[in-house]
UniProtKB/Swiss-Prot annotation:
Listed name of the protein: Adhesion G protein-coupled receptor A3
Motif (PDZ-binding): 1344-1346
Gene3D superfamilies tied to this protein: 2.60.220.50, GPCR, family 2, extracellular hormone receptor domain, Immunoglobulins, Rhodopsin 7-helix transmembrane proteins, Ribonuclease Inhibitor
Residues of the signal peptide: 1-21
Gene that produces this protein: adgra3
Summary of subunit composition and partner proteins: Interacts (via PDZ-binding motif) with disheveled proteins; leading to the localization of dishevelled proteins to specific membrane subdomains.
SUPFAM superfamilies with a match to the protein in the record: Hormone receptor domain, Immunoglobulin, L domain-like
Compositionally biased residues, Gly residues: 1266-1280
Region (Disordered): 18-45, 1157-1188, 1202-1284
Bilayer topology: Multi-pass membrane protein
Subcellular location, record wording: Cell membrane
Record region (GPS): 679-728
Protein task: Orphan receptor that acts as a critical modulator of planar cell polarity during gastrulation. Controls the localization of dishevelled.
Xref: InterPro entries: Adhesion_GPCR_A, Cys-rich_flank_reg_C, GAIN_B, GAIN_dom_sf, GPCR_2-like_7TM, GPCR_2_extracell_dom_sf, GPCR_2_extracellular_dom, GPCR_2_secretin-like
Length: 1346
């Protein structure tokens, strides 16, 4: 027995421990009872609170596991799936039950039985789909109930009837459907005054987000379209399967009505179960009383199953569907090749796609405006394209994408806007602003959108009068659009015909409102309406003309029609054509209505008293009447006819259009020329409403160059069609210019060619600077280009491209001519104002030569930039004016692109001309432009008598004539100025008269043509005379070119003569007073190595003369005396060579006889004779020049002026002159004879002789250093030895036989430095600068000759 008790205890104790284990795992807390605390505070009983959160319970623990006094039970955050009947029996003291955040899907009735004291119940955040009506039965003390965030969409009526103490209710759900099934709940809440916290409707969308307490019962209906809170189909994406596979489908939807059914469809056909095909369908069943589901299984899928499979939920309130596209692939699948599609929605590159698949691509431009394009999600904003089963691309859809062009997108947005009385005027103005870009329309939808908007705006035209004007302006803008775009819009949606019909309705509305007349106009469309009484009608004549309309402000239009030219009607109440007293008008068309127009209606009194509404509508061209189909009138054989006149529409409301007793005569102006003219009228009903041209009942009465008169027996749309050339444009009738223009222009071209060819062919021999040569050739070339383009291309208006090219070239050549004239004037001004050059410092390199390209950048670059910008802005600025008789720029662009720049350039040119005149008046001595001398020429010049700059020759009454060889330009500055100014003036006048000759009507054009011819002849003669005939070198070249014998003779003569030799061989020079003198040629001149005269002209090889020969030639190198007696010194031999120092006494020097520019105008009283040598020779290095000049300066202190080193005697004894002259003459003749005998056999003996040169102190005669003589080292106080005195005496005996000689040396042959640069010699006297004798630095007194 004891053993049995032990075993029983061993069995019972574990059971008690396990049964209490659940409760012991929960946390228990003591909680003071509120009722006990009030009744007996001292002896209060303790209540228990049990917390079983996060315990992973899958069901509610047994109530026995909880303490008896449990008043609060927390079972949140577990995995409880359902609440069974009697789950909380025994917890009669429980006041709070929290079961939130579990996965409860079902609650059985009686689950809360026994909880009589329960006051708060929280069932939120579960999966409760529905609640039974008796689920809360017995909870009489429940105060707060929370059912939020569950899956139920509705609550059964009477579910809260047993909750008599309920005060707070929460049942917010993302699936809550506020329909007729919740009407009872709204009424119950208001009756019981239940507090509902944050409970809002989720469906339908019309009530979404509204609080349940704010709804009225009548707003909760079941009439709205069916909206299911939950509707899912699996799979939801498109499927690609292979033949023979199995594919299951499942469909689930919220259960909202008892009669709900789930059905399956394929491509719109209901699918039934078919075991033979492997199709199985499970019956509908309700899950958790909130969802209805169905399953479809295809066990053996076949290619025929490809298509859209649809799950359809059918209820009495409506249907709802979900669709999946299925593609069944066979074993040999095909593919669509990659493709690129470009349209108004962008460019799309479709990839290689499997046959039967629909490919999707995102839109190129994302949606920027809400509510404009269908579909707001990114998935909907896609373009798709289907690849059919044959591997070919099939239908596509881009409608959900935005247009790429801004204009098209804005027009689409405007078209989608709803119009009303408040915004119609503003919308019409916006549309007018955007149609100003009509010339740039490239998409047919642009025109379609505008046509649709015009129709919408026309509905409000009766209310607002200004809308009619706006509609006319909008339609006028569309006439500037491309004809191809209008044709496509007409074919797509009858856009053009709809606009014309809308404009016709405007006129009728105006006259219907009681107005007797109405008119409006625009650049391309004119509208006129009249109320006509049949009894008083005597005929009418209406004329269409274009004129500036000051009444209305017209927006600027882009395109070929100028906004100033407005089309307008002028009507007279008579049938005859009256003279129009209208200024600055161009007649485009005229219409004559006969007096018998209303006779066909009979003579009844009612008909005679009737008032008819007549409206006239005129279009500048036929773009709004594009034929979309072929007709006999448009294509007759190989001919293709097009509208070549304005289109005029005439219509009388309520009046028959055909079979008039008297015809209507219409005169139309042709803007295009063609052949085979046909009168026609537009029939809106042809081609299935597309419209077309017909010619029945119309004939041509008269036709001339510009106008065609048509007679028709009907009231309709009138026009003339003609056969054009294959390019679709007019057959050009060439209208030549006046013969005077052609003949005189030809003469001008020949003159310009002669000047250009002469200067190019004789470029190296003509005496003109390089700059002037380039400027003259370019000036003549651009004048030639202007003349040629004007004569040959100004009237080439038949082709727009050719005409534009002519306008651009004429624009460029005109500006370039003016700029080259300015460049030439600037060059003359710089030469006139240029200062004399000084010796550069030794450390300063010579400036580099400036490129000639700078002139081309100005003369040609600026016009190219101006023309390029003008053409890039709008190429139609050139040669695109309608009916323009010549190829030139439009008026407004030409103001800023041509007339303004041309006027400014000419103004700058005139300022340069005036500045040159002022400078020449201030400095009359500046006449010529001289050559720049090289370094050797500057150091060896022997003929400079006064200051001579490299640029100017200062002219004075005593100046010597300038040799031609010293001139850089044969023309004087005044002559150059006259040439460029005269050319520019004649060119400008020629341009003006040419423009007037082609722009004016007869007979003014004849007058200006004659003036053009006279100026062309004058300009050609002026250019030839000034630049060719008036130049010695060019005359010589022309004379040589004319006669071959004479040319050969001239070459021989030129080779025998020295540059400035006279006819007898004497060399010409000038005195100080300007008297010409001669000096006979000495023996020294003819003893130059026994060479002939032609050899002396070679500029690169001179005669080798010894020092004695140079002395013998001194008779020819004596400089002339100045007018005031000041001596002019000779410094022809002033260079001292360091490398030839030993041989300097007898070294031969190579001299070349050539003229040198001299000017003997020294002022009296000057202490020194100054000279300004030019820039050093550019090919010498800086170091070479520096070392050379340094040695020269050093030896200038030490080198004596005689062989023995003795001091030369300064005073000149007059009684020794004759003896010295005789001795020196005999000596020179002997040495010349001896040199001729020995020059070819051996080297001159003087090359081997040398004499030691004693140095003298550097501070010797420091105060008498030689000054700045123009002869490079010549001093006023130069010393003369005996031989120098002889030469001076000899010069006296030959006062009129002076020769200007310049010695040029080879690189290793230098002259003798005979002047002391540091001052006069010891014990010498100063030379009187006012003496009248000619002082020269003499040669060596003694010459050693072997």
């Amino acid at each position: 027995m004891s053993v049995l008790c032990v075993l029983l205890l061993a069995f019972v104790l574990p059971l008690r421990g396990s049964s209490s284990a659940g409760s012991t795992e929960c946390k228990t807390y003591d909680e003071r009872s509120r009722s006990a605390g009030k009744s007996s505070p001292s002896g209060a009983t303790l209540d228990r609170k049990v917390v079983c959160s996060n315990m992973e319970f899958r069901q509610v623990p047994s109530p026995d596991t909880f303490p008896n006094r449990t008043v609060s039970l927390i079972l949140s955050n577990n995995k409880i799936q359902e609440l069974l009947n009697g789950s909380f029996v025994g917890l009669s003291s429980l006041e709070r039950l929290d079961i939130k955040n579990n996965i409860i899907t079902h609650i059985e009735p009686g689950a809360f039985y026994g909880l009589f004291s329960l006051k708060r119940l929280d069932l939120s955040k579960n999966l409760i789909g529905c609640l039974h009506v008796d689920v809360f039965k017995g909870l009489t003390n429940l105060v707060k109930l929370n059912l939020s965030e569950n899956k139920f969409s509705s609550l059964s009526q009477g579910i809260f009837d047993s909750l008599g103490s309920l005060k707070i209710l929460e049942f917010d759900s993302p699936y809550l459907l506020c329909d007729c099934n919740l009407q009872w709940l709204v009424v119950w809440i208001k009756e019981k005054a239940i507090g509902v916290k944050e409970t809002r409707c989720s469906f339908p969308r019309s009530l979404q987000g509204q609080l349940i307490t704010t709804l009225r019962a009548e707003t909760l209906t079941c009439d709205a379209p069916l909206e299911l809170p939950s509707f899912q189909m699996t799979p939801s994406q498109h499927q690609i399967v292979f033949q023979g596979d199995s594919l299951p489908f499942q469909c689930m939807a919220s259960f909202v009505d008892e009669d709900m059914q789930v059905l399956w469809y394929q491509d719109g056909k209901m699918v039934e179960p078919d075991a033979t095909q492997g199709i199985y369908i499970e019956k509908s069943m309700v899950q958790n009383c909130s969802l209805i589901a169905s399953a479809l299984t295809i066990s053996n899928i076949q290619p025929g199953f490809t298509g859209n499979w649809e799950c359809r939920v059918r209820t009495s309130r409506g249907n709802n569907t979900r669709t999946v596209h299925i593609v069944v692939l066979e074993s040999s699948a095909k593919y669509c090749l990659p493709d690129r599609v470009s349209n108004n929605k962008g460019e799309y590159r479709w990839p290689r796609t499997l046959a039967g698949i629909t490919a999707y691509l995102p839109c190129k431009r994302q949606v920027t405006g809400a509510g404009i394009y269908s579909g707001s999600s990114a998935e909907d904003r896609r373009a798709w394209r289907r690849c059919d089963r044959g591997g070919q691309w099939a239908e596509d859809d881009y409608s959900r994408c935005e247009y790429m062009k801004d204009v098209t997108r804005v027009l689409y947005i405007i078209n989608q806007m709803p119009l009303n009385l408040t915004n119609v005027v503003q919308t019409a103005q916006q549309l007018l602003a955007y149609t100003a870009e009509a010339p740039n329309f490239s998409d047919k939808v642009d025109v379609i959108f505008v046509a649709e908007m015009i129709e919408k705006i026309g509905k409000f035209a009766e209310k607002y009068k200004e809308l009619g004007d706006v509609m006319v302006d909008i339609s006028s803008n569309l006439l500037l659009a491309d004809e191809r775009v209008l044709w496509m819009a007409q074919r797509e949606a009858r856009a053009c015909s709809r606009m014309v019909e809308s404009l016709q309705r405007i006129a009728l509305l105006r006259v219907s409102n009681g107005a007797l007349a109405y008119s409006t106009n625009s650049p391309n469309i004119a509208l006129e309406a009249h109320a006509i009484k049949a009894s008083s009608f005597n005929g009418m004549t209406c004329t269409l003309f274009q004129k500036l309309s000051p009444e209305r402000t017209v927006m600027a239009h882009h395109g070929e029609i100028s906004p100033e030219r407005q089309l307008s009607f002028k009507c007279n109440v008579t049938s005859n054509l009256s003279a129009l007293a209208l200024k600055n008008t161009i007649v485009e068309a005229s219409l004559q209505l006969p007096p018998t127009l209303f006779s066909s209606l009979g003579s009844s009194g009612q008909a005679e008293e009737a008032v008819y509404k007549l409206h006239l509508l005129a279009f500048r061209n036929g773009k709004l009447f594009p034929p979309t189909g072929n007709s006999s009138i448009l294509s007759d054989g190989s001919k293709r006819r097009s509208v070549v006149t304005p289109v005029m529409i005439t219509k009388i409301e309520g009046f028959p259009l055909r079979d008039l007793l008297s015809p209507v005569n219409v005169t139309l102006r042709r803007f295009l020329q063609g052949s085979d003219a046909v009168p026609a009228f537009w029939n809106f009903s042809l081609q299935g409403g597309q419209g077309g041209w017909q010619s029945d009942g119309c004939r041509i009465l008269h036709q001339d160059d510009n106008f065609t008169t048509v007679s028709c027996h009907s009231l309709n749309s009138y026009a003339v069609l003609m056969d054009l050339n294959r390019t679709g444009y007019n057959v050009f009738i060439f209208r030549p210019l006046h013969p005077v223009i052609y003949s005189t222009a030809l003469v001008l071209v020949l003159c310009l060619l002669s000047v250009i060819v002469s200067y190019i062919y004789h470029h190296k021999s003509v005496r003109i600077s390089k700059k002037c040569w380039h400027m003259l050739v370019n000036l003549c070339l651009h004048i030639l280009l202007t003349c040629a383009v004007f004569v040959g291309g100004i009237n080439q208006t038949y082709n727009a491209s050719v005409c534009q090219a002519m306008g651009i070239v004429l624009h460029y050549s005109t500006l370039a001519t003016a700029l080259w004239s300015g460049v030439t004037a600037r060059n003359i001004y710089k030469q006139v104002t240029r200062k004399a050059k000084r010796y550069e410092e030794l450390d300063e390199p010579p400036p580099p030569p400036r490129p000639m390209l700078r002139f081309y950048l100005i003369g040609g670059g600026i016009p190219i930039i101006v023309c390029g910008i003008t053409a890039a802005a709008n190429i139609k600025n050139y040669g695109s004016q309608v009916n323009a008789p010549y190829c030139w720029m439009a008026w407004e662009p030409s103001l800023g692109a041509f007339y303004g720049p041309a006027a400014f350039i000419v103004f700058v040119d005139c300022m340069y001309f005036l500045s040159i005149l002022i400078q020449l008046r201030r400095h009359p001595e500046r006449r010529f432009e001289l050559k720049e001398q090289s370094e050797e020429q500057q150091h060896l010049s022997v003929t400079e008598a006064t200051e001579i700059t490299p640029v100017h020759l200062e002219s004075s009454p005593t100046a010597q004539p300038v040799p031609m060889s010293a001139l850089e330009n044969e023309h004087t500055f005044v002559s150059q100025l006259m040439g460029v100014a005269g050319s520019l003036t004649l060119y400008a006048a020629l341009w003006v008269f040419g423009a007037l000759a082609i722009s004016q009507e007869h007979p003014a054009d004849l007058v200006f043509a004659c003036l053009f011819g006279a100026l062309a002849l004058g300009l050609g003669a002026f250019l030839v005379a000034h630049h060719c005939v008036n130049r010695q070198d060019m005359r010589r070249h022309w004379s040589q070119a004319c006669c071959l014998i004479r040319r050969n003779y001239a070459v021989q003569v030129d080779s025998l003569l020295l540059p400035i030799a006279g006819s007898s061989g004497s060399v010409m020079t000038s005195r100080g007073n300007g008297e010409a003198t001669k000096c006979p040629a000495s023996s020294a001149e003819s003893s130059c190595t026994n060479k002939s005269a032609p050899s002396l002209r070679n500029s690169t090889q001179g005669c080798k003369l010894t020092n004695l020969q140079v002395e013998a030639a001194q008779c020819k190198v004596v400089a002339p005396s100045t007018a005031n007696g000041t001596a002019v010194l000779d410094n022809s031999l002033t260079e001292h060579s360091v490398d030839n120092e030993i041989k300097m006494h007898v070294a031969p020097i190579e001299i070349q006889y050539r003229p040198s520019s001299v000017n003997n105008n020294n002022l009296p009283g000057n202490a020194n004779i100054t000279g300004h040598p030019g820039r050093h020779h550019k090919n010498r290095s800086r170091a070479h020049r520096a070392s050379r000049l340094t040695v020269l300066r050093e030896y200038s202190y030490d080198v004596p002026t005689s062989v023995e080193g003795s001091v030369q005697s300064v005073p000149n004894k007059r009684h020794h002159h004759e003896s010295l002259h005789a001795r020196n003459s005999r000596r020179a003749a002997y040495l010349a004879y001896r040199e001729r005998q020995q020059s070819q056999l051996q080297q001159d003996s003087s090359d081997a002789a040398s004499t030691s040169v004693p140095r003298r102190s550097r501070h010797f005669s420091k105060g008498t250093r030689i000054g700045n003589g123009f002869g490079h080292g010549i001093s006023n106080g130069g010393l003369l030895d005996g031989s120098e005195a002889d030469v001076t005496n000899q010069t006296k005996e030959c006062p009129k036989q002076t020769l200007t000689v310049e010695l040029e040396v080879q690189p290793k042959s230098y002259g003798l430095n005979l002047a002391c640069q540091n001052g006069s010699a010891k014990d010498s006297e100063r030379l009187n600068v006012e003496s009248s004798g000619n002082v020269k630095t003499g040669l060596w007194k003694h010459e050693t000759t072997v």
